[in-house]
Amino acid sequence: MEKVIAIGVPGLFIVGIIWLIITSNKRINNALSTASKTLGFTYIPSKNIFRKKKIFGEIDGYNCEVEVYTRSHGKSSTTYVSFFAYFPESFEMGLKINWRGEFDGDDEYLTDLFIKRNEELIETSKKNLRRLRVEDAFVNSRKVLFRKYYKADEIVKTMRDVLSLAKAIK
């Protein structure tokens, strides 16, 4: 009896983990599919549950995309959802504003002007858009895939927030 318990309990644990992974994958796929229909985007499902999932399209002249991907960190891994809004034209300043709020650019004068015009807007946006990054070509917000992003309306809302920021940046 003890041998059955010693083998059965770990076996049930492993089956439970596999079931949880498959169920979570189905839920995010359904949320992405629904969000893509709402936004009018194209959805590319992944056959493999560990591969990147992506929806993309255009809103008001801005190419947008949402990616769900897993990044390994040694023995553990984290799944992220990343929202991109690409500017119709690049600023071509070598501009980089990372998620910590650190600014960098090739042309210091132009970069300083850009920062002065947009600093308050970006700082305010960082409250809603975690890990916010702004570069010459795009605005990006990356978040850990929590339960709320299994809902299509949260994906749509965050994509629209990222797009609104991209439109407001001058």
State where each predicted segment sits.
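Solvent-exposed, well-ordered amphipathic alpha-helical segments
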Residues: 4, 67-68
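Generic signal for short, ordered secondary-structure residues
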Residues: 14-15, 141
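Charged, low-complexity intrinsically disordered regions
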Residues: 31-35, 39-45, 50-52, 56-59, ...
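Feature marks short, highly hydrophobic, charge-poor N-terminal signal-anchor/signal peptide-like helices
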Residues: 1-10
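Transmembrane-cytosolic junction motif
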Residues: 15-39
